[in-house]
Amino acid sequence: MSAIIEIEHLRKSFGENEVLKDINMNVNKGEVVTIIGSSGSGKSTLLRCINLLEKPTDGKIIYNGKNVLERGYSLPKYRTHLGMVFQSFNLFNNMNVLENCTSGQMTVLKRNKEEAKKIALENLEKVGMARFIDSKPAQLSGGQKQRVAIARALSMDPDVLLFDEPTSALDPEMVGEVLKTMKNLAHTGLTMVIVTHEMEFARDVSDRVI
């Protein structure tokens, strides 16, 4: 298996507080890697560094053989290859479900409306949310919102999908539906990096647990 992402000697500090210290890890294409650890250990910061929502203090992030932190590398282009599912869904409240899943495709990937709609519907079907296309986020449960967020990320055709504790903001009865959705995506060719406290889930789906 070839590495799609290689992290070498990564460090991240906030002022005097060094959150990530000399992190080294590889993620192979199609692999499901789960990162576990105690609260405050820097798991979410690592994901945010991988997609450059946070700029690392030092080290390398190598994507398909090229260091994305080198001057001249196109960060917007790099970010189009990474999807991220956040704890707090981050849906657009003024848009319905379908619009949430098409707006990024049309704006960033320059797809036309019909193509974007077709791809969005395919992914909403995958996560069991196709019948809610006209609903606004306020009309959905937390679990439903997170499944829409997953469909939205998938609709951007990412090479790597990052999950930052996707069930931590959910009521216990809604956790299962999101984990089931993620389990169905695992080992379909999509590369997944997951931060979670769900240990049983991590054991079931992961190729590696870090």
Regions found by a protein language model. Name each.
Residues 3-210:
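ABC family nucleotide-binding domain
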